[in-house]
Amino acid sequence: MKLLLKSVIFIFLTISVIGCLEKKPSKTVTENGVINVITPSDFKTNSVGQVIIDVRTPEEFANGHIEGAININLFDKNFESKLLKLDKSKPVFIYCRSGRRTATASKKASKLGFENVNDLQGGLQKWVKNNYKITK
């Protein structure tokens, strides 16, 4: 009986934690501007003609990325200096594989003075799940 109760509690906690990991669409007002977590549909529509930044490694980027994206690896020691070469007053659209690195990159961009940062909810995984194309 104890084993069954422990198993049920473990399953419930696992499902709860997994459900909380994916970021939901949201808007965070920062000192310098706003960070928007947006759906793949909104990202696709609103990023046309804008700066799209893929923060994954160059190897991940080479395996497929959103068309028109530039690769600025979050783990690169020059990540912030590369970001600063972009116009901070224009919207930027940032993504990674699942959304975790994007959250970090979005906060860094905002601290650097970017006024309108858009974070792809669920990253490239969710982009592909929505049947949107990637390019190599």
What label would you give each PLM region?
Residues K2-V8, I18-S41, N46-Q50, P58-K90, ...:
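Rhodanese-like catalytic fold shared by cysteine-dependent sulfurtransferases
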